[in-house]
Regions:
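S-adenosyl-L-methionine-dependent nucleic acid methyltransferase catalytic domains
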Residues: 1-138, 184-353
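Flexible, glycine-/basic-rich loop-and-beta segments that form/coincide
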Residues: 128-203
């Protein structure tokens, strides 16, 4: 199996390099409005943002920032296939402007924007990303009533483009081989994820401190899960806010195609420096999934409840008929650089089979 991966150093408010209905899934984490680390970016996109902040017009700044994101949402409506899924990882912001502290509900604003463009909202996910700082509590400490709840979660908002789900040809191998294990379904499709911790995506050792400071990447597990949940082999995943390339890395490990857009070429250079590690990552991710499944089966067996079906490609039982054709892939080779990559995948090699 071969997949292709492209990264454009371009502004994602204009995705004219992509044709209509050319991607099946969007997985992205945009810059969060009213988070201070993104003020400079939003100001470059629209100087009115800085003017509003300097004037203490927090609501005006909030709306101006979201107006820039909405130009991207307009493009997503065009390039995403009917029935395709968009997964938007976004967090709310807390901030004091002109001496007044409040929360800025980014998730609600994004939800409104997508629904107004004809997307159907689907059940979303909260993922908890606890911080361990001793000073994480805001306000008056232990004195009521002026202390504030600390935000330790982000949202994965899920939307379908239009009212109908995607169609597949009956018995499509690319869909059945992309199945997930029954116990993965139960964990992944829970509305609260407590087993994924927030962290900065590791960059290469020679990346500059400035590049690290500007990295707001979500953990690899977030896009990897979403890609497995909402796409099949042969699909293309788009990330219009590419950053350090976590979505592309996850798409490669999941054996899907991908497209990314990024304003800063330095992130692409850092991705090229670490591309040699992706083959080993894909192998370890696949083997970990299979080993977790085998441990799950063993626990079921000890409880006297052995799953009733056999996997076709692995020496293990599975719970449902739909899992029988499941086939994991690993990377055998990667060619290319500077935003154009061709990846060869082969069935996961597991010595214990």
């Amino acid at each position: 199996m071969e997949t292709t991966h492209r990264v454009f150093v371009e502004d994602s408010r204009d995705l004219s390099t992509l044709e209509d209905d050319s991607v099946e899934l969007v997985v992205t984490s945009p810059p969060y409005p009213m988070i201070e680390m993104w003020d400079d970016l939003f100001t470059r996109l629209d100087p009115a943002v800085e003017d509003a902040l300097e004037a203490g017009d927090d609501r005006g700044a909030f709306e101006a920032m979201h107006a820039q994101l909405e130009l991207v949402w307009d493009e997503l409506e065009r390039v995403l296939v009917p029935g395709g899924i968009a997964c938007i990882n976004v967090g709310d912001a807390t901030r004091s402007v002109d001496g007044s502290f409040r929360v800025y509900p980014n998730h609600a604003r994004v939800l409104e924007a997508f629904e107004s463009r004809g997307f159907d909202p689907l059940p979303d996910v909260l993922w908890r990303k606890p911080t361990n700082s001793a000073a994480k509590f805001m306000g008056s400490g232990t004195l009521p009533p002026n202390a504030y709840v600390t935000l330790e979660h982000e949202y994965v908002l899920v939307f379908r483009n239009g009212g109908e789900s995607r169609d597949f040809e009956p018995g499509a191998d690319r869909r059945y081989e992309a199945a997930y294990f029954w116990e993965e379904r139960n964990r992944w499709f829970s509305d609260v994820w407590t087993d994924v911790r927030g962290e900065l995506q590791d960059l290469t050792e020679d990346a500059t401190d400035d590049l690290r400071d500007r990295s707001g990447a979500y953990p690899f597990e977030i896009p990897y899960r979403l890609i497995c949940m909402y796409s099949a082999y042969g699909d293309t995943v788009l990330d219009p806010f590419w950053g350090t390339g976590t979505t592309t890395r996850a798409a490669i490990c999941a054996a899907r195609n991908s497209v990314g857009y990024e304003l800063e070429e330095a992130f692409l250079e850092a991705f090229d420096d670490g591309i040699g590690e992706i083959a080993a990552l894909s192998r370890s991710v696949g083997r970990a999934r299979l080993e977790r499944h085998r441990s799950f089966v063993e626990r079921r067996r000890e409880a006297g409840d052995v799953p009733g079906y056999d996997a076709e490609h692995y020496d293990t039982p599975v719970v449902t008929k739909m899992e029988r054709s499941l086939r994991l892939r690993e990377v055998s080779s990667i060619e290319g650089e500077s935003g154009r990559y061709r990846v060869e995948h082969e069935p996961l090699s597991v010595s214990s089979d």
